[in-house]
Curated annotation (Swiss-Prot):
SMART domains: Pumilio. This is Putative pumilio homolog 8, chloroplastic. It is found in: Plastid, Chloroplast; Cytoplasm. The keyword Chloroplast applies. Coiled coil: none annotated. Keywords: Chloroplast, Cytoplasm, Plastid, Repeat, RNA-binding, Transit peptide, Translation regulation. Residues 10-20 have a biased composition (Low complexity).
Amino acid sequence: MMRGEFGEASSLSRSPSSPLQTEPHPQSPKFYRNHYVFSGDHSSYNSSSRFCLRSPSDYSLSSYFSNGLCSSEDGSSQFASPPLDGLMTKYNFGGDDLGLCESFDLLNVGEEDKTHHQTQRSSFGNYEANGDGGFRYYSGFGVDQKDHQISNSWNLGMQSCNMNNYSVPVHGKSGVGALFDHQGISSNPNESLPKVSEFQGYVYFMAKDQHGCRFLQWIFEDGSALDALVIFSEVIPHVVELMMDPFGNYLMQKLLDVCNEEQRTQIILMVTSEPGQLIRISLNAYGTRVVQRLVESIKTRKQISLVKSALRPGFLNLIRDLNGNHVIQRCLQCLSTEDNEFIFEDATKFCIDIATHRHGCCVLQKCIAYSSGLQREKLVTEISRNSLFLAQDPYGNYAVQFVLELRDFSAIAAMLAQLKGHYVELSMQKFSSHMVERCLTHCPESRPQIVRELISVPHFDILIQDPYANFVIQAALAVTKGSLHATLVEVIRPHSILRNNPYCKRIFSRNLLKN
């Protein structure tokens, strides 16, 4: 069952090993519809550890969790209210569903309390992207909750935390409808919110929850230094796991932005404590974001050295991975040429493997662009030496084209020597034909040799009708001049009968055949 999803009680089983389950609260209220259950994955390491609410006796209501004060409309929050459908009263809230009990009598709430609409309440509601951490403040909840009537302890086995001290009214809002009204979010920066110290011991669990994670990020922005220190001290043992968590990774990115150099070094020491650990994080869809942010933020020689040493053993895996290649690119962007030496050396060593890979070919071009001097010369020379093979590869041909555009004359000379005598076969292949066109447009010195090879074909009519070679001939007609252009036109004209062929139409256009 997905997180925050409700179903029949018979479809789930309680996991006795879950650290988050609690014994039934002695004063738990009874629900009419006891066949509904709530289950959610809330384990620290084992996804099979679960907590679930299976019966009325298990509902130890919290004044800001179980009574719908912590509710997720899409069911994505692990801290969720009881089922939204069918478990709430209708007479007091104008049809809005919040997941409350059907009858206030079951909660031991008096008549005066039922109609008391001005009681101030706070809730941990759906977070909006406005930096409020997901906390909303409302008046007119409709139920004056009493500490002796409803347990104030968390339903997840957490300690009691009375939220009533932090309630701030939102004027003009009343009823349960305000809880889901985005306009009901308080924007007053002076309002007092719960302190992280009140959640001490549970920051790790909050970091893995969608709304809890956002609240913790808000603390880094507007909370006290003590609160930020509490968060850091509680997440530092779990940084590896949180970096690869769908929600925790955002907290780790924020932490790297706001922490000091000593704390950043602590984080780096944690993620590099085991061989291959930083590589594993970099290959993860969520972890790669945090490692990229880490690379952006490192400043000291110790930090840079630790990161380089941890990444180098997995260089080839990283550069060919959908997620990992972005870490290498971020190193190229953020580190100095000297610090990227290990990247340039390994890129030269594994040049063919990288150039012929979907992701690797892109990173190889970035390596050439960010390198200089001897480092660039080695990379370009390696590509030039293998240009004939690379030109025919779906991805390698891009590396050859990139070198051609650099206008490095020694590299181009070596490349043209490799390609000489193969222009016809290269022109008739899908990938290498692009490279021949690029030679014609960027290397004037290559044009005579290419044209001579093309017109020397015994059956030139086959060449101009080829789905790929016809583009090479068009490019040759467009860039050649003088006697070379005239020679090419003389060879083409006798085949004018083919002018209606779909591949020959542009070749026989008036503009291209002009002398």
